Amino acid sequence: MGIEEKLPAGVLLTSVEKLVNWSRKSSVWGATFGLACCAIEMMAAGGPHYDMGRWGMEVFRASPRQADLMIVAGRVSQKMAPVLRQIYDQMAEPRWVLSMGVCASSGGMFNNYAIVQGVDHVVPVDMYLPGCPPRPEMLIDAVLKLREKIMHEPLGPNGRKMLEARKARGDVPVVPYGSMPSSYRSDKARRAEWTKAVREGREEQLRIENWMKAQPHLQQYEGLKK
């Protein structure tokens, strides 16, 4: 009814916002970030049997600057957390994160100091996928749900507000500065401390001590070393 009846065949009416979101959701390229067992299922989903290319995801990019979606497949160690964050920061907007598997979402069975208890402590997550590991069909379903979310994302002033809120949630990682080797590179004092610890063979002890100092709920254990 209405103006649609007066248009010739093959002409569609839409808005710029919906057109942009349609183009975004129809070509979501993933970043290759497989960390553990879930990566096997992720690779299977991209194979010919499941063929994620049907939804414009036939290409996984090794360069974060050419990727739209980071699929964190597997548990994230404390040493890998700053690398993950760096790759996320190198991805251009708009960008999305899918936490694949229970280990990436909440630490899973690895409830210890070496594993980040949820990748949302490091980067903002748009979609959580449970499972240990989730099957390729489950990953495809999560991607399709993420496509629906992308289709309804606002643009213009509302989009800027959403982007600012996302940055406010994700730009301050929980991983404390100075708690792992990669953060020592830009701090001369900490780098000297780390070099000394390496010479004495106690770099792992130093890393754990610095990590515990950065965790308020672990201060009660400081007295056990004395």
UniProtKB/Swiss-Prot annotation:
**What is catalyzed by this enzyme?**
a quinone + NADH + 5 H(+)(in) = a quinol + NAD(+) + 4 H(+)(out)
> Does this entry carry the keyword Translocase?
yes
EC number(s) on record?
7.1.1.-
Cofactor binding note of this UniProt entry: Binds 1 [4Fe-4S] cluster.
Which residues take part in binding [4Fe-4S] cluster?
Answer: C37, C38, C103, C132
An example molecular function term from Gene Ontology annotations:
NADH dehydrogenase (ubiquinone) activity
Tell me where in or outside the cell this protein is found.
Cell membrane
- Could you tell me the membrane topology recorded for this protein? Peripheral membrane protein
Q: Please name the GO terms of the biological process aspect recorded for this protein, alphabetically.
A: aerobic respiration; electron transport coupled proton transport
**UniProt keyword terms in alphabetical order:** 4Fe-4S, Cell membrane, Iron, Iron-sulfur, Membrane, Metal-binding, NAD, Quinone, Translocase, Transport
- Does the keyword Oxidoreductase feature in the UniProt annotation? no
**Record's NCBIfam families?**
nuoB_fam, PRK06411.1
Mind telling me what this protein is named? NADH-quinone oxidoreductase subunit B 2
Question: What is the protein's species of origin?
Answer: Salinispora arenicola (strain CNS-205)
Q: Which gene encodes it?
A: nuoB2
